[in-house]
Structures are given as structure tokens and as C-alpha cells.
A protein has these predicted regions:
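Extreme N-terminal starter segment of soluble prokaryotic enzymes
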Residues: 1-2
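N-terminal intrinsically disordered, cationic/polar leader segments
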Residues: 5-15, 21, 36
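Short beta-strand segments
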Residues: 6, 32, 76, 132, ...
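Short glycine-enriched loops at secondary-structure junctions
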Residues: 9, 72, 77-80
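Compact, glycine-rich, soluble single-domain proteins
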Residues: 19-69, 82-110, 115
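Residue-level signal for inorganic ion chemistry
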Residues: 45, 75, 139
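Glycine/charge-rich, flexible interdomain linkers and switch-proximal surface loops
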Residues: 58-72, 121-133
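Positively charged, low-complexity, intrinsically disordered RNA-binding extensions
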Residues: 92-148
């Protein structure tokens, strides 16, 4: 499972011209489900998202987790599994089949909602989304459960 975490001041998802999700200060997490990913990957990623320390203290050092009023926007993005090895056209053969990927994405969403007293919102799986972000920093962190 691959994720990209971005610290944001605001984020929103629009599908077919309609606003479907919106957050203020917090994290936007793009999620790519890879063939062979399991519930173990879901819990590992949830732990990383819940505990990542990318919010700064007074000395501008990243030492704090998401603040109590922080929000999370979880966005499915199979293109994180795209490979350009030997080609200029992305190859998505490592992306999980849509049905299984949606199942694992929904489990991650559920786990984060249960573990957080904060607001957790999501994009729309399998839909074309317009994602607007106000990235803070910029701070962008990549994580792959397989260490790639």
C-alpha cells in the first residue's frame, strides 16, 4: 500500500461539479492499494497516519501529531501504483483489482474514523475527482508498506 500524506490548511473533493468532501487544517492522504495488500497493511498505514509528526513547534521543528482540531481527507488514488519502468506510458498492473481495493480503502476509512475523535472525510472511490488543496509548507511524505 502506498500513501502520500500532505499537510494542508484546506482540502476539498468535487465530483461531477458537486462538493463531496471538505476539510480545514489537517492531513490529506492519497491511498494506492497494491496487489497483495491485506488488512495488515491497512492497520500499518492507519498507525502511520495517526502518529505522523509533521506539525511544527515554536522552533519550526516537526514534533507534533495532528492537532485535536485537525481533520483528515482520505483520497483513493490507484495511479500511485503507476510505473514508468521502460516506458513513458504509466503501467498500472501493480494496482489491486477495484473491488478488493475498495474493500481495503473502506476498511482504512473505518479504522481511522474509529480511532480518531477527529473529522475523517473521503473522496469517491472509482470516480474522477477534482481535488483542491491548500498545501502547508509544503510538507509531503511518501510511505510504502513494502519499503519501495
Amino acid at each position: 500500500m502506498r500513501i502520500v500524506i500532505q499537510r494542508v490548511l484546506a482540502g476539498e473533493v468535487i465530483v461531477s461539479g458537486k462538493l463531496v468532501s471538505k476539510i480545514d487544517n489537517g492531513l490529506v492522504v492519497f491511498v494506492g492499494i497494491e496487489k497483495g495488500d491485506t488488512e495488515k497493511d491497512v492497520f500499518e498505514v492507519s498507525r502511520k497516519i495517526s502518529n505522523i509528526r509533521i506539525f511544527e513547534n515554536e522552533a519550526q521543528r516537526m514534533t507534533f501529531k495532528l492537532p485535536d482540531n485537525g481533520e483528515i481527507l482520505l483520497i483513493p488514488q490507484f495511479t500511485l501504483l503507476g510505473s514508468l519502468k521502460g516506458t513513458l506510458r504509466p503501467d498500472f498492473t501493480e494496482a489491486e483489482e477495484p473491488e478488493r481495493a475498495k474493500e481495503l480503502f473502506n476498511l482504512l476509512l473505518k479504522v481511522l474514523k474509529e480511532d480518531y475523535s477527529r473529522i475523517v472525510r473521503d473522496g469517491v472511490f472509482g470516480e474522477h475527482m477534482l481535488v483542491n488543496l491548500q498545501i502547508d509548507g509544503p510538507v509531503t511524505i511518501f510511505y510504502d508498506t513494502r519499503g519501495k
